[in-house]
Amino acid sequence: MPTWTEYIFYKKLGKAPSPGDVVEVVPDLVGFHDLTGYHVLEVLEQMGKVEVFDRGRVVVAFDHLAPPPTQRAAELQVYIRRHVKALGLPHFYDVGGGILHQIILEKYAMPEQVIFAADSHTNTAGAVGAFAQGLGATDIAAALKLGKTWLVVPTPFAVRVVGEFPKGVMGKDVALHLLGAFGAEGFNGYSVEVTVEKPKAFPMDDRATVANMSTEMGADALVFIPDEVTVAYLHEARGVSYKPPALGGGKYADEYTVELGRLEPLVAAPHSVDNVKAVAEVEGIEVDQVFIGSCTNGRLSDIEVAAKILRHGRVKARCIAIPASYDVFRRAMELGYVDVLTKAGCVVTYGTCGPCLGGHFGVAGPGEVVLTTSNRNFKGRVGHPDSKVYLANPAVAAATALTGRITDPRQYL
């Protein structure tokens, strides 16, 4: 029997390719955002007539510099809007719609699909069992115009998740654990296939976080093999029925087991995603700003745990909270989470990447320390190159905002 990745490629190609093969694939979905869209469309213009192979398979979102903080950003968005209108693209999400990867996960991604987008965190859609990969602007332009593009078939690697999350531990800690175990390039050339022993103990939001940060692990893709949680998510979110195929017995290059019960809240310290430490090792470090959000940890359960902790008082560090999409924001408002966050002193806004890339809405200054739920912490990522960035789960982030120092959240849960 094939592995999940092999199964997807077999369906696409009509034959079973081997790892390392260069193949042409017809994507089920292609996406770009405001920061990469200009380059994608520029390449399309250079190829001749600006056209797409299938308007219904294209998703565009303004998320990185939205609302535009500079005149140049506004100019780029005007340019992209003009092309979106001319092409008649129906799946366009303007300012406030949310982050591209969250929108794809919420509304479009399906198991067994191949998804390409002009952003490195396209892997997020692997949470539902799609083979999702970020590509450069030239390759995305080719996929849009020709309806196909090339890739190198990755080597399957198995990760088995057993047990249940202890208090204060989330999907982010699984991602950081893997980074600590394998390093920032440990899965280069691999498609990581994750099976979950107790599916209901590992919700979709946490799966999305792990899939998202597989980029930092160097993985070509990370896919959660569909199970009952996948089926329930697709039905509840979109009213879509899905029955996973019966696979098993595939051959993997290697395998690794994550025991959830042995994990604790983790932190990636400056200036590398694989500089992973237990929260106790960095507890007490003063923090100037906390960011809760991004395509990594801006989903509803992330906002929920932050609100649960921030009910305990007002923040002592600047706190910015950004739900990853309009739908998440709206639901967080309905459930009272936004009210809790604002009363605690957090600044809350619609879905935007904002401070994650040091673009706007919370850029770090010289010498400042930032703790964020996003996915990267190299020098200058959140702003000034002399700032320091720590990565952690939303519970650690909320507890840190509450005390003004890096804090173990378990005392508040």
UniProtKB/Swiss-Prot annotation:
SUPFAM superfamilies attached to this UniProt entry: Aconitase iron-sulfur domain
Keyword Aminoacyl-tRNA synthetase assigned: no
Family matches, as Pfam families: Aconitase (PF00330)
Catalytic activity: (2R,3S)-3-isopropylmalate = (2S)-2-isopropylmalate
EC id: 4.2.1.33
Biological process, per Gene Ontology: L-leucine biosynthetic process
Keyword Iron: yes
GO molecular function annotation: 3-isopropylmalate dehydratase activity; 4 iron, 4 sulfur cluster binding; metal ion binding
Required co-factors: [4Fe-4S] cluster
Swiss-Prot/TrEMBL keywords: 4Fe-4S, Amino-acid biosynthesis, Branched-chain amino acid biosynthesis, Iron, Iron-sulfur, Leucine biosynthesis, Lyase, Metal-binding
Enzyme class, spelled out: lyase
Entries under PROSITE patterns matching the protein: ACONITASE_1, ACONITASE_2
Residues that hold [4Fe-4S] cluster according to the record: C295, C353, C356
Pathway assigned in UniProt: Amino-acid biosynthesis; L-leucine biosynthesis; L-leucine from 3-methyl-2-oxobutanoate: step 2/4
Cofactor note: Binds 1 [4Fe-4S] cluster per subunit.
HAMAP family: LeuC_type2
Subunit organization: Heterodimer of LeuC and LeuD.
Main function: Catalyzes the isomerization between 2-isopropylmalate and 3-isopropylmalate, via the formation of 2-isopropylmaleate.
Family designation: Belongs to the aconitase/IPM isomerase family. LeuC type 2 subfamily.
PANTHER family hit by this protein: HOMOACONITASE, MITOCHONDRIAL (PTHR43822:SF2), HOMOACONITASE, MITOCHONDRIAL-RELATED (PTHR43822)
Protein name: 3-isopropylmalate dehydratase large subunit
Species name: Pyrobaculum calidifontis (strain DSM 21063 / JCM 11548 / VA1)
Lineage: Archaea, Thermoproteota, Thermoprotei, Thermoproteales, Thermoproteaceae
Gene label: leuC
